[in-house]
Amino acid sequence: MKKDIFDIEMELVGREVYSDRLFLGHFAPTNGEQVVPICLPGQFVEIQVKNCDGVMLRRPISVYAATERTLDLLIQNAGKGTEVLCNAPVGSRFNILLPLGNTFRIPEAGARPLLVGGGVGVAPMYALGCAMKAKGIEPTFLLGARSAGHFSDLSHFDSVGELFITTEDASLGEQGYVTQHSILRAQKFTHIYMCGPTPMMKAVARWAREEGIPSQASLENHMACGIGVCLCCVEPTVKGHKTVCNDGPVFDTTELLWD
């Protein structure tokens, strides 16, 4: 195991519930003297879920935010394992492996980055936006979902950069997909970053390529081990097959065989 990966017992110390299927969990080490390892934008954790029939493997969750004392994870109920996490009361304890994966390349000062997120893919976009703002770069967020009830707290994003929204049912923001939003025609961007459902990212990457804008994507392939051993998350690239958990999850979209 890499020396910079830690195995930490953490307690769920707070919850921000957005729907019956989505919440932001605040975790802290059970050992008060333990410091949360530095987690870079795009990196993720693997949570061990105990006492759940049929769930043997850890669950990968993107890092939303992290400090020396707390770790925030945006968790969506997508199956047995994450259902346990979504229903866990404050005070529940979990073994968490972190930090895993690579990170985004942040542009130089003066850049105009667009951060595109869909579903729980908004989590690494928030972490990235905060990192950019800390370096004096103003990010623009473009977030999409089926309806308004599928979003987390949008005020978090609005406090970091300019925010634009799309929903398929027109319940919030512009109706349609992120690639149909008027902001793509109204403003010029120098860099594109994305995380969300693969069809969404493919469409965004295609648009970015047509516009001649470099783009990076954080992939959401199914993962098991989180350290590149089991090979269940392999993604074909122009440089051969890569493990998303270890070589990624962040890739330059020119590396991906999406066409």
PLM feature segments, named:
Residues 2-90:
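Ferredoxin-reductase
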Residues 14, 65, 165-167, 217, ...:
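Structural signal for conserved beta-strand scaffold positions within catalytic alpha/beta enzyme cores
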Residues 80-220, 224:
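FNR/FR-type flavoprotein reductase catalytic core
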Residues 53-61, 101-109, 245:
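Short, Lys/Arg- and Gly-enriched loop/turn segments at beta-strand edges
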Residues 124, 198, 220-249:
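Local cysteine-cluster metal-coordination motifs and their immediate loop/turn environment
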Residues 249-259:
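Short microdomains enriched in Cys/His and/or Lys/Arg
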